[in-house]
Amino acid sequence: MELFSIRIQRTFQLVSTIEAYDENDLKCELGTFFPSLQAYVYRAAGEIYAILGEQDKATEFYIKSQYYSIQLKSDFDGVKSGIVYSFRSVSIYSLSDLISNTITVCHPSKMNDPFDSLFLLWSSESNLNRICKNNAHIKPFSDSFQYFKIRSFVGNKKLSLDNNLIRKVVMWSHYADAHKGFCIRYKLSTVFIKQAQGNGYSHKYLKRVHYLSKNEKCDILTKKKDTNSLFIWKSTEWKYENEIRLISYDPSCKDDHLQIPLDKNSMIEAIYFGYRCVESNVKNIMQILGEGVQYFKMDYDPNNVYKLKVNKILYKDYIDT
């Protein structure tokens, strides 16, 4: 008991020191140098508060721990701007992003594959109860994960322009409503690629998905999992996607979806309309975005019908000016 009291005292001394910096808006600068220390201290404080029965306080400190645990995690820190692609069906949700100039992230439970992210399986209360001896901290710790949201894109290793990604028939079939949808080409600034925000302990960053080989196994029975790894490992069956993930952590949003505004240096550069996208949808999207965006229409290649062609189309040919 005496050792536990000493641990409490030392942990709270460190918490007081770190919070003093946080309150003076120095958290991001400090996080650049030793984010692992903040993550560890806040997590220890969360565990202590949970043992003391203060669940709300425990959740508060676990949230702060999550913020620091994902610092310095972007795969593209040296990229000044990056190109990513998003295949979409024509829906109220996809059109809303175009109208509001936002990118919507969602809770991993809303993704099409229930095994899409280790996050859901490992951080569940049932799994944590299975692998942890003490369970006082499990609910607040598990609750701190609910504010993670993700958005999937397609991109190459350098985040550069790549029409080969657009020509993949399977992507149009699976993610663009059987070629009736469209694909957005985004240019994202370095600020959008990785950004920690002020007082709200929110953070977002781009990460490349890694695919496990057929001989590799991925278990959820390990006590310690790097938060980063919970979002980036997928089965090798998905390797064809070339997936890039935008991972967002925002404790201020309790909904399953969050619209993130594009900053002034990020933009929609181009729209690619699917081979079966009807003209009314083409016109509607053009009217939303205007003439400042490039437009293309997918078509089959008569020399190879299993490979798509990218044909440029003009705004003025569809919209009366």
Language-model features and meaning:
Residues A44, E60-T321:
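Partner-binding and oligomerization surfaces adjacent to conserved cores of proteins
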Residues Y21-E29, S69:
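Alpha-helical junction/boundary sensor with strong preference for TPR arrays
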Residues R7-R10, L14, F61, Y68:
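Alpha-helical solenoid repeat scaffolds, predominantly canonical TPR units
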